[in-house]
Amino acid sequence: MDDIQKEAVHPLEAMGISGEVVQAFNWMGFHNLTAIQEKCIPLMMDGHDIIAIAPTGTGKTLGFGIPMLEYVNLDDSSVQEVVLAPTRELAQQIADELTNLAHFIKGVKIAVIYGGQPFGKQMSALNRKPQVLVATPGRLLDHMQRGKYSPRNGAYDGARRSG
């Protein structure tokens, strides 16, 4: 009998997810994938677009956030990924989760913009050249109309429906 025991491979590692993201996933207190994550992450890593509907609290944010962060090009300082959220509370919650998930990735920048925040604070966030932008539709449109943000380089990666 072999004295060497095989170490179990983390399910995210088996999907080709970077060590930094796996480390953050564990650091956030998660050790197992939820059903929505098991289904969505491999499809998104293979470049498929998905529409996923699942109850609150089932891990949707990490389900799209993990592949999203894997595709961020740290050498590109333009907005590469955009997440739209219907409310400021949800936008902030998503930004917080993505920030935690990116904790061990050096150089990734995430910004959140939504109504009710001072416009100057949001301009400062955009001027820091985030690769990931979380926004409410109205405030994103406001920045676009003022010429402060152009979606020409952004990718559409997530939608949330309230209710």
Regions found by a protein language model. Name each.
Residues 37, 49, 60, 80, ...:
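Short, cationic motifs built from Arg/Lys/His that form the positively charged side of catalytic pockets
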Residues 44, 122, 163:
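Short Asp/Glu-rich motifs
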Residues 54-58:
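The conserved Walker
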Residues 2-53:
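Conserved pre-motif I regulatory segment
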Residues 7-10, 61, 109, 121, ...:
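Residue-level signal for pocket-adjacent positions within structured domains
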Residues 19-30, 76-148, 152-156:
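Conserved nucleic-acid-binding Ia/Ib motif block in the N-terminal RecA-like helicase ATPase lobe
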Residues 38-50, 61-76, 96-102, 141:
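Walker A/P-loop NTP-binding motif
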